[in-house]
Amino acid sequence: MSFVLYLAMTAAELQHHSAPSFPIGFMACHFSPYGTGLSNIPHTLPPGSLLMVNDRTPVNNHDPDLIAAQLCDAAQCLECSGIVLDFQRPGEERTQKIADAVCQLPFPVGITPQYAGKNRCAVFLPPIELAMEPEKYFAPWRDREIWLETVRDSTCIRITKDGNQQLPPMEEGLPYPHTDRELFCRYSIDVQNQHIDFHLCRDEGCLQELMEACTKWGISRFMGLYQQLGPFYSQLLAQDTARFQS
């Protein structure tokens, strides 16, 4: 593969899988509710994995230097290929101080857009919306390294004389006979008297094409949920093995 897909796992999924041989994104590390550092730092990970920190527990009196030191030690001991700061609470000054401290570490760091502006580390972007062209989506970050979250997705866009609206996707199993090479999705069109519905779907095949195309924008790290993309990852490994053997 010309890209790396990390499968994001919870602590329970990692324990159940029993030492996966592929690099993962460990997404169970968070701010301690009882101290000033981090909780749930794993004892072992597959080499080359990403250590992820979320802010589901709000920042209180947490120590940026302590957290940076914990992550530095963990990344070294676990042979991680990088750290992801998956911070979703916007505008937290104390969270920004933690991000600033972690981004000074001698490891690749990816951070969500809310806290990426003041740092020169990679930006960790959410999945591309189905109706958005990738190049336009990446444009605000063209001078930055980008790590991209990927997901199987589907939606419906209804067009009326009054404008557009996004609706839930159509029933699973219905066909998507058309392909859009610009949006990396498949679609169907339902024309009615008062509206036109565009049903969009990004399945595993579209995801693979998207990730391969993203390399031309310098994007080579992708993250997807293990519970959703685990079988897809196995297919990618099988394709690589077949190419190598041939």
Task: Show the residue positions of the predicted features.
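Substrate-binding surface in catalytic domains of secreted glycosidases
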Residues: 80, 86-174
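Glycan-recognition patch characteristic of GH18 chitinases/ENGases
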Residues: 1-70
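Aromatic-rich peripheral "rim/lid" segments of glycoside hydrolase catalytic domains that contact
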Residues: 227-246
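An active-site-proximal structural segment forming one wall of the substrate-binding cleft
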Residues: 62-83, 101
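A structural motif corresponding to the C-terminal end of an alpha-helix
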Residues: 45-47, 77-80, 104-107, 137-144, ...
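Hydrophobic faces of well-ordered beta-strands that scaffold small-molecule active sites
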Residues: 3-9, 22-27, 47-55, 83-85, ...
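Glycan-binding loop/region signatures in secreted carbohydrate-active enzymes
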Residues: 147-209, 242
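Extracellular low-complexity, Gly/Ser/Thr-rich intrinsically disordered linkers
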Residues: 193-232
